[in-house]
């Protein structure tokens, strides 16, 4: 297992490279809407789970689909910066943290209203 500092550094590198590529080097207008919010590497560094968000939450499935279409290009951009032995497989998922936080906020508002 890689040490925590190294893993954190590699996760940060992946986030920076993918965000930069999506913003500046991808021609797909829908994929450009995505931004990386977090990256989690597997223990053996072979898989990177990349959490995506977009300004328009209702279009996230289409954004995810288009990002997956350009994943090979994104992986090659990452390979140019990668310092470890093998570039990880990229797995893109929708980051549901914002939706969850909004749900919790709504619950707190309901509780506050019931107290008043």
From Swiss-Prot:
Q: Where mainly found? A: cytoplasm
The answer to whether the entry has keyword Cytoplasm is yes
Q: Which InterPro entries match?
A: KH_dom-like_a/b, RbfA, RbfA_dom_sf
Assembly and partners are described as: Monomer. Binds 30S ribosomal subunits, but not 50S ribosomal subunits or 70S ribosomes.
What HAMAP family does the database record attribute to this sequence? RbfA (MF_00003)
What is the role of the protein in this entry?
A: One of several proteins that assist in the late maturation steps of the functional core of the 30S ribosomal subunit. Associates with free 30S ribosomal subunits (but not with 30S subunits that are part of 70S ribosomes or polysomes). Required for efficient processing of 16S rRNA. May interact with the 5'-terminal helix region of 16S rRNA.
How is this protein named in the record? Answer: Ribosome-binding factor A
| Taxonomic source organism | Ureaplasma parvum serovar 3 (strain ATCC 700970)
State the taxonomy lineage.
Bacteria, Bacillati, Mycoplasmatota, Mycoplasmoidales, Mycoplasmoidaceae
Tell me the name of the encoding gene: rbfA
């Amino acid at each position: 297992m890689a040490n925590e500092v190294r893993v954190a550094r590699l996760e940060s590198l992946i986030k920076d490279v993918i965000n930069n590529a999506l913003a500046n080097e991808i021609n797909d207008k829908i994929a450009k809407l995505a931004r990386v919010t977090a990256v989690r590497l597997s223990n053996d560094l072979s898989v990177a789970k990349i959490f995506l968000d977009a300004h328009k939450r209702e279009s996230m499935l289409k954004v995810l689909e288009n990002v997956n279409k350009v994943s090979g290009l994104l992986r090659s951009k990452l390979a140019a910066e990668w310092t470890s032995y093998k570039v990880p497989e990229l797995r893109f998922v929708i980051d549901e943290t914002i939706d969850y936080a909004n749900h919790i906020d709504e619950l707190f508002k309901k509780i506050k209203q019931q107290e008043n």
